[in-house]
Amino acid sequence: VDALKKFSIHVSIDDYNEAFWRLFSSDLVPAIHPTGSVPTFESDSREKGGVISFSAESVVSLYEHLKKQSMMLHYNQASQLMMNAYTFIENLEKKNFGITCFDISDFIVINGQYYVFVNDSKIVELDNKDDVLVIDEPIQKGEFMSPELKNLTRIPSRIPKTTTLFSLGSFVGTMLTGERLKAEGDIHSDFIYSIYYTKLYWCIKQCVERNPKDRGYIYI
């Protein structure tokens, strides 16, 4: 077993408070248990955010993780990424927040097997009553954005919260197959055909439906 090292994650979103960061920290617990330390949160009033600190065997960026294996994930790794990211989506929704989109630079990999989302600049307000993300300022663009987010023409705007699922599905699918989701045509067979009949195939397929109302997350 590798010796434990200390790591920290700096955060600085105005809307967050200590209670929210305790929820965020809980996402780290499965990644560092049982060898790591319980994450701690220290607020910083000057930055209107804080620092989450913890110990683990290793922490690398997802990009560094991918470089070791031809910039792709194996099936079990992609499944873990999908489940880890969706758990974080669910945790955010409980606090009325959502994520605009995903990309390689948004994740760290803890102990070589757990994927944690750390890009707080992509977190926006979620209206749980209407199931929409509230976009009230310019957002960070990304390759794996949903069509409705790519075509956003005015701010403020409200877009279906399933825009996050579209991004998650297209992102994980590309990490696994190396294929890009096409703008037109039979995106499912071209995009993730190589994993047809697997649990992850059907999960991704539903995430990337063109109609936001048809999207969902089912991984069974």
Regions found by a protein language model. Give the residues of each.
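ATP-binding glycine-rich loop module of kinase domains
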Residues: V1-E42
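Conserved structural core of kinase catalytic domains
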Residues: I32-N76
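Activation segment signature within eukaryotic-like protein kinase domains
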Residues: L81-M82
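Protein kinase catalytic-loop region centered on the HRD/HxD motif
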Residues: Y86-G98
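Activation segment/activation loop of eukaryotic-type protein kinase catalytic domains
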Residues: G98-F144
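Short, conserved alpha-helix in the C-lobe of eukaryotic-like protein kinase catalytic domains
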Residues: S167-E179
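Conserved C-terminal C-lobe helix
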Residues: I195-R210
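A conserved short helix/loop substructure at the end of the activation segment
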Residues: V208-Y219
